[in-house]
Every structure is written in C-alpha cells, then in structure tokens.
C-alpha cells in the first residue's frame, strides 16, 4: 500500500534534506573505529561497521546522525580516495587460490582482495612485495575493495627490500640511465685554456662524480682571486636531446644509504664530466676576488674553460693537516699553497657571513655502514671539518655570483627562495618571542634584515629551545624562476649551478650562464619545470627518509626490551607524546604520553608551548636531552617506541 506513495516519497525527501551532511577526511585508528575530520576543527565518530566502507585518508561526504547524544558519521559518497597506486605485501590463505594485499601503511591493516594484471606473470608467494592500483571501492557502488597488482617488487625476506620497495613507492628509478650516443659539442663557445693552473679537487675519498675544482692566488693588494671550476655536462647534453629528457625526468641524483642512483649515465657523471686528476675536462668557471674583510669584489666573471685538476684531495686528509694532526701531508709546495690560501678564503668568507648574512648551526650527519648483504654494521657520525667548510664557502660564493649575474643580465634563472616567516602567523611569532624576553616588530621580522637580526640573537641564546619553537612558523624553501630572497641563508638572492652532474636545476643555470657568456637569447624557465624539480626533490628526500627508517628499525630491533640506554634529544612535542632523536645514531623514536606520567588528566603535552607539564609544572622542553631505552620496534611499520629512564 506504500508503493508509489507520494506522501512517503515527500517524507523521505524531507528527512534527507533535513539531515546534516559534511565533507571531510577519514582518520583511521588501530581499534577499528575512525573519525571524520572536517576542516581540522570538528570531528565525527565513525563506528567500525561504517569504517568497512572507507579507508583512512579517504575524502568523503557523510550524513551526520545523533545516537544517544553522540554525533555519528555515515559515509555516503567518495570524493577522493586515499589509495590509488600503492605498495604492499601479498597474502595467501590456506586452501584458497585468491590473493590479498596489505598496503604498507601504519593505519591500513585490512587485507584487500586483488588479482595480477594480465602482463604480470610472476607466481606470487606469501609475503612478496608488490605494487598495485585500486580498482573498486564500496562508496563507488562496488561490493567491496579490490585492487589490481601491476608489478612484482621483491621477495618478502630479501634484505634489499628497503631500497626496492621504497623506490617503487615513490616511482623512482632503480638503476643508472644507459648511455646514448653523444659527443662533446661546444658549437661556437670559446674556452680559455686553464690547464696550466694548479686546480685541486677536495672530496670524499670514494667520490667518483667530482663536479668542482678550486684554484686560488693572492693579489698584491691582499685580496684573494678565487677560481671555481664546475664540470660542464651541457657540453655533451643538448637541450631537448634524449639525454636531456632523461636528466629532466630524474632531476636529481638520488642518494640513499649504501649507494646512489645517478641523474646522468655513469659514463658521464663518473668519467667524461668528472673533474678527475690529470684529466683535461670542459668546465664553466666563476672567478671572483675575496677582499680582506671577506666581501666579494666587483670583478666577478663567468667563462668557459678547459681545466685539469692536478690533485684529488680527501676531506679527512686535508682536515687532519689543517688541524695539525699527524699523518697526511701535502705532496708538493703547490698543494700546500692552495690549501693554505683556500683556508684563508674560508675564514674570510665565514666571518663575513656571520656578520652580514647567516650561518647554519652545524648538525652531525649520520651514515649507515652496510655489509655486502645490505645489513647495517654500524652507524657513524660524519662531522663537518675544516676541508668541508672550505668547499662549502667556495660553493656558496659561486652560487651568490651566479644569482647576481643571472638577476642583473637576464632577470630570471632557477632560484632557491625562502621567504622566512609565514605572514599569517607572524603575530604568533611576536608573542612567542615576547614571552621569552625578546621584543620584535612583525613588519621588521618579515624583512630580510629583521629576520637576520633575530636569527643572530637566537644564536646567542643558551639553548635552542626558542629557535625550535619559532621554526615551525617558517615557510618552506621553494624553487622559483625569478630572483627572490633566501632568508635562511641571509641573502637577497641565491641560485645554485655547482652540481650539474647531480641536479637538473644546475644544468638549466649552466645554459643560462652560457647564454650570457655568448650573448645569445635563452628562454625563462617555466613554472612546470620548477614544479617538476620540487616534486622530484621531495620524492628523493622521502625515499632517503623511508629507507633510513627501515634500516634504523633493523639496527635497533635487537635492543628492544633490553636495559641498554640511549641519550636522546626532544625534537617535537605532540598531543600524544614526544618525538626524540637518538644522539648517537640519529634514529627518530616516539615516547607515548602514558610513559611520561600514568595519570592522563595530570599530563599536558603542548606543541604550542614546546613543553610537557605534569600537574601544571614543566618537566620537559624542546631540545632537552633525556635518557631512554627501546621499548618496542614495530618492524611492519618501522616505528620505534622508547621509554624514559631515570
């Protein structure tokens, strides 16, 4: 009798229109239920049965119902799925020929029914790593989730899984590109012959892709004439050639623990373009005077040249000699002169940057030592020493010169731009500074000079607490086609060109500098190019982090549940607890709030104040050093959980 009843249809329509509907992101939990977060302000409970229709990270619309004074979200429509392409582990069930896959994500625990694509011929075993794409979703009207395996990665127990799984996840290449036919072609470019000069290369002892060499002399007026020779792969790589397209697609050499995957074929990066000792190589050279006060002279110039590095020197050897440690000595008077004058250049420039720009506080670099099977044997700290600082100052000088020449002659290039504080959050910065006894004006902090003045003041603080608190209000560095300030370095413009073997952005700037030298026209880099460079840089950094997390988990797993203690620095404070970095090896671990104090209502972990309060009293702050032991290492998610010890 209710069939085709217009009153009933009207009632249904009325109920539908009166029901609140919202759009938001699904946040899963390990307990089966979830939440729908709307604009970061409001969240609605999603009960376990309704969570079966969605995944963590899905963007959906949902109807909001009230049950016993509790607002509950009922998923209705999918706007954007969280999972599209993903990596995971294949699962097989007893007496069942079907395959399932578990996505490699800490909050995605459920198996997804899957089948291999037609072109995938691998016979999958339990635990194999695979890459898949989602094909079905309950909110699209399908009966359940289903995926299609588009590729086999590696066996589940293979020790090289961290590398191959991570590279596949981020759609990064696994091998060096093959070398196409290409010849050195300078066209009408004239090169000055500098092969008689005593250029030296300072690098790691094992480095093959050497892209810089240095030469320096002292002028009669006390200034230093510094020549920075940079390898010139653009002599071999013509714009829009096959090799150029390969370099553009990769954009950067990918440095991972244990090995690297080059942007260019190794025949170029490690041989034809590498500034090897006693080898004549095409180069682009920047020449500039360093005045006695460290300022750069007005005589900076760029030109193409032939150079021959006379000596390959190792960072540690040069540092040992400069720091008066016994052992290595320069092999000739020429090398001694070069090292001595380069050290003088470094001191002048570093002192000038401390006074007129900014110098980063040095942090240790952690390096994994691996055996041939990919096992972590040790994690060592590589400190930045005297020779590293020489090369760093020379490269910064070269990049400053390029930024100025490109700006003055063309008005464009590939620039690294960092604009300091986020303008919408500047009032919060002022408030935090005031709480800690520093008076500052918002407008001044948004200018380069004001930012630099604040940074120098923060460097004088007894701890890094205040620096860490305001760092989260800063913008991210960007790759831009126009000149712009780099607040982090304290410069009004900064453009890199010193690593063209490893960075496509530097190849672009090489071509622009050559256009200036030859007085020819060159197009401004497009926004599309800048976006490609940004995305590939981000993917490479995430890959390095992901492989590192995996290796840290393997390295620390034997210490889980033992009494071994580690010194750790608090690097972040969240509502749920502390993120810490183990001082000896650099591993990131999490300390849950329940490990800090048993009574939850008496504990407050505040990211805003950068402190942990128990009963209203601060017990921990950002950058504090605490002792911990490893409570648990969750190998499936590569998460390390630590517990404080007295």
Curated annotation (Swiss-Prot):
Keyword terms, alphabetized: Cytoplasm, Exonuclease, Hydrolase, Nuclease, RNA-binding
GO molecular function terms listed in the Swiss-Prot or TrEMBL record: exoribonuclease II activity; RNA binding
An example Gene Ontology CC term for this record: cytosol
Protein name: Exoribonuclease 2
Family: Belongs to the RNR ribonuclease family. RNase II subfamily.
Function: Involved in mRNA degradation. Hydrolyzes single-stranded polyribonucleotides processively in the 3' to 5' direction.
Matching SMART domains: CSP, RNB
EC category: hydrolase
Cellular compartment(s): Cytoplasm
Known catalytic reactions: Exonucleolytic cleavage in the 3'- to 5'-direction to yield nucleoside 5'-phosphates
Entries under NCBIfam families matching the protein: 3_prime_RNase, PRK05054.1, RNase_B
Domain RNB, residue spans: 191-518
Pfam families in the record: CSD2, OB_RNB, RNB, S1
Species of origin: Xenorhabdus bovienii (strain SS-2004) (Xenorhabdus nematophila subsp. bovienii)
HAMAP family: RNase_II
Source organism superkingdom: Bacteria
